[in-house]
Design a protein with these regions (language model features):
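Short helix-coil boundary/hinge micro-motifs
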Residues: 1-176, 183
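BZIP DNA-binding basic region
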Residues: 153-213, 217-219
Length: 219
């Protein structure tokens, strides 16, 4: 979040409103785990693997810290929870398995293919697990997972988010990026479902450059 700069003025410091970005947030590594282009949290979760259609996708959730950083960046947990949970490392493999199951279901819907009952069962089992407590801090309401059960509880939230989308009429609007092996999913809310790319500044731009090259190569 960008900080406003204002001209110096005399104020009553006791009446100042707290800054929106606390010290804890400024200490979190700033490297972006994945861009938020899916339009829904569950789809952004799916997009934490690059080149998702490749035999070996580019994994962004490499460890517990990278998952916590992503969860903070998308607003799933607050900065304070990031540091609290960082000291209670959990395996990231079950989280990645859940993500991949959500992705396969979303991909099947986008491609109009048969959905795996095994994947749906995995989503259901995670969604039925206990969810975190909720806390209100400053001007936000966030999940507050128990340190020793954070993986299970956050997985329950993500699975619930996924099922809320996949079981809704909006599921038919799930699209897949046409940028080669990208495979990122998004909710196509355009008129006539004409969206083709995860991001026009990324895969869309490369496709445009490729068309330009092919056109002028023939001249």
């Amino acid at each position: 979040m960008m900080m406003k700069t204002t001209a110096p003025k005399t104020v009553n410091t006791a009446a100042k409103r707290p800054q929106s970005r606390g010290v804890a947030e400024t200490l979190i590594p700033r490297e972006l785990i994945a861009r938020q282009v899916g339009g829904r949290l569950a789809l952004d979760f799916c997009n934490t693997a690059g080149e998702h259609l490749a035999d070996r996708p580019d994994e962004s959730l490499r460890d517990w810290e990278s998952f916590l950083r992503w969860a903070t960046q998308v607003g799933l947990i607050g900065p304070e929870s990031y540091f609290e949970l960082l000291h209670h490392t959990e395996p990231v493999v079950p989280i990645v398995r859940l993500r991949d199951a959500i992705y396969r279901v979303g991909l099947a819907i986008a491609d109009k293919r048969r959905i795996s009952e095994r994947d749906v069962a995995l989503l259901r089992d995670h969604a039925n697990a206990r969810r975190p407590e909720i806390e209100a801090r400053n001007h936000a309401v966030r999940w507050k997972p128990a340190p020793r059960h954070a993986s299970e509880q956050l997985s329950a939230v993500l699975a619930g988010e996924a099922l809320s989308l996949l079981c809704s009429p909006q599921a038919v609007r799930i699209g897949i990026c046409e940028g080669g092996l990208c495979g990122w999913l998004f909710l196509d809310e355009s008129r006539g479902k004409r969206r083709r790319w995860c991001d026009m500044n990324d895969c869309g731009s490369r496709a445009k450059a490729r068309r330009y090259y092919e056109k002028h190569k023939e001249l």
